Amino acid sequence: MRRWWAALLAAACVLVLAGCADIPTSGDVKVGQTQDVKNQDVVLVPYPPAQGEAPADIVQGFLTAATGQQHSYRVARDFLTPALAKTWNPDARVLIHDQPWQVKAVSETSIVVTVPATAEVNAEGVYTGYAAPRDRPVPFTLAKVNGQWRIAKTPGGIVLGTNYFGSLFTARPAYYFDPRWSQTVPDLRWFPARNITPLRVVQALLAGPAAPIAPPVTTSAFPHGTTVSSVQVASGVATVDLDTGSELPSLTAVTRMRAQLEDSLLNLKGIQQVQVSVGGHVEHAPTLPPTAAPPLSALVLRKGVVGTIAGSDFKPERTLGRQIAATGPQGGTVSLSRGFAAVRTPSGIEVVTAGATRVVDSRPGLIDPTLDDRGWTYSVPQADPNSWRAVDARGHVVSVAVTMQDVTSIIAIEASRDGTRMLVLASTDRGPIAFVAGIVRDTSGVPLALTSQHYDVDVPASTTALDATWVDAAGSSVAVLAQDDTGDDVTVQQLGGLPSSVGRLSMADTLVGATSLKDLRARLQNGSIAELSGAVWSTDPSVAADVLFVQR
């Protein structure tokens, strides 16, 4: 099964914060400062409150000190009244911004800071980015304690600049099951890098998945209302003590709970194995078997022959190769392990099996189809973004309900390897967009709809989007190929995470992922296949293809 994740590493750093704008005690709105820590190796060192500081200084000091995670934000708590210092929860949320905030003093004891948030992290560690900044007011009420101003009331959470966030927080996935209990599905969470603990990760896991993959898209083995009492780690083994209430889990349930916990905690604090304890009693459950790794070799159509490319070696494919080639494929998805392919041809969308080939969608203007793990083929016309169809291996056709507001055309679609999510690349009047939505199914596994809630994927507005693909076997990251005036850029983004460029290409038209970032491939318009090596794309002149297929 499972373990195909790579946590983002926080940078080691040392920075003394300084140069903050004064906050007025009355009058009109003023603009605060932002600070840039790009390309600096820094540790944030906050200052405690000084004697005689005014309310405005206390608010400014608190906002600054909240970047210091040491000792559970001890310095930040010094700016609060004793009562609030005991209850203030810095983990309630993170407001992330890259533009100055605005400050309004309502009175001597009341101040409101309005943060133009570009993203937020909620109490469960779920990151949500925004296409445009959203104003988030943060109110402060102050009172005197022993003659010194302190904050008596303010919501939980902290405010961070974008660059601070990347240094102070680290990401790791919590794992849930697909509806068939066959694979675990990653759900990225963000935690303070200095304060991340196994207990915090388990609490986030028990809180449930993010909205795009909430049930019925995924499911969890933990009974509703389950809480965690403790997580003890010894010799690489984490013992997770759970309270499942009145429901005593079965051995099957405990086995699945262990799988979710093991995937979510792997390598944190040296954890290599997990024991599940319910009410203080250790439950001895077996380990679920690993999921088979997907193919690594590129599958291509080359001079009328379908085959695999490994290095510069081309080997004709003997399972479905001839049947696929006979359709005149222009793109699509192939599952050699299942003996099944869905390809776009001059006739429309054709499904290829060892025994037959048939056209399942002949509508005009169709884009490349995608294939899920249950054998459903999805198709949609480029210019009709709300007309999705799915057809199963027996030819049963269903309409898939989607909500594509503002979308003018569909560029690419690709189902995740576990069949729980759909990657969509599309055009709008404002520019290209990409997102990942959950696939909602009935109890028989028939796809019914894509979720209206989704993960946003970054695509620069000034580019022409060309293709998108899943990067890794776990389905934790996606990549987008987009063209600007100087060439083609490939951006990789963890779902619920931050985007990063992985190098530039020239004249690319297809992007295909496999098991990890190093297996990402692109086809150029001259037929060359480019492979990623570090942050550089390399091509072998002897390796060329007319079509580069997605594999499942």
What are these regions (language model features)?
Residues 1-9:
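Bacterial N-terminal signal peptides that target proteins for export
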Residues 7, 14, 21-552:
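Bimodal "functional hotspot" detector
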